[in-house]
Amino acid sequence: MDQWLEEIRAALPELVVYQQEPMKKHTTFRVGGPADLYVCPKKQELPVILGLAKKKGLAVTVIGNGSNLLVGDKGIRGLVIEVGAQMNAVEVQGNILRAQAGALLSQVATKAAAAGLGGMEFAAGIPGSMGGAVTMNAGAYGGEMKDVIRQVTVLTPECEQKVLSREELDLSYRHSCISKNHFLVLEAELSLTPAPEQEIRAKMAELREKRVEKQPLEYPSAGSTFKRPEGYFAGKLIMDAGLRGYAVGDAQVSEKHCGFVINRGNATAAEILQLMKDVQERVKKQSGVTLEPEVKMIGEF
């Protein structure tokens, strides 16, 4: 690790490398132990960082806005790369919008609206970035990334850039081919539909109101904790199992929306994980349905 640090500082003197960086600062759950090494690079720095990490046998974890993650209390070994503020450019040409992987979905939706382009209204309130949204085919209120993606540029494990069409991405409910192939999303190109800006903004405002009314936005969470089982709603199954408000330490099933697990203050990853397991067991016993986590678990628990 020290050798990697030495070499990366020589190769990229302007890159800031954080050591023992608390991951709770970088996840919307506000939990997670320290990352051994943490960087937030520019696009052109990525091949150098990844190449050196591979050469030194350093484990690499890539995150975006940290909005769909549960990081273990013992943190993450090796190197964490945040694709974020240094990679968030958004540009519009005609009905095509290009967004770098670190661009926030709210930023992308606002830019699309300003250009009179519809199709991203559903994403305005999703607290994620473009890279994560593509990776998990994020969606809400009847829309999903699959509807608007034209193509995506990724970095392969061999540090080669590759362009994937929508078909090649193999998009389905909360799934794409990105994770299993260990690709890193660099940029997404979206094909949007011209529409009056006023109509687009009205739709965005309507969906924002729904979120505020129905979701526990006042507490740290990772959004929907479980995937929607075929033919059911996770929140309804959890409520029917008598788990509204159920808590383990400072982790709690939201009383406002049972599909959300919230951090009431100082929850640990262990408490959240235990609560999720309890919910899965009770729901399985009550309804026979197996709930699958939508939240991605990384690091050491």
Locate the predicted segments by residue:
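Hydrophobic, well-ordered secondary-structure segments
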Residues: 105, 109, 123, 127, ...
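A generic local secondary-structure boundary/capping motif
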Residues: 68-69, 109-112, 120-124, 137-144, ...
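Structural signature of FAD isoalloxazine-binding scaffolds in flavoprotein oxidoreductases
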Residues: 32-44, 70-88, 135-166, 180-187
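A generic alpha-helix structural signal
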Residues: 5, 9, 46, 50, ...
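Anion-binding (especially nucleotide phosphate/pyrophosphate-binding) glycine-rich loop
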Residues: 2-130
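Phosphate/pyrophosphate- and phosphate-bearing ligand-binding catalytic cores of soluble enzymes
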Residues: 18-19, 25, 155-274, 278-282, ...
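Gly/Ser/Thr-rich beta-alpha loop segments that engage phosphate groups in nucleotides
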Residues: 34-35, 66-70, 74-77, 104, ...
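Short, well-ordered alpha-helical segments in soluble proteins
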Residues: 112, 130, 134-138, 153-156, ...
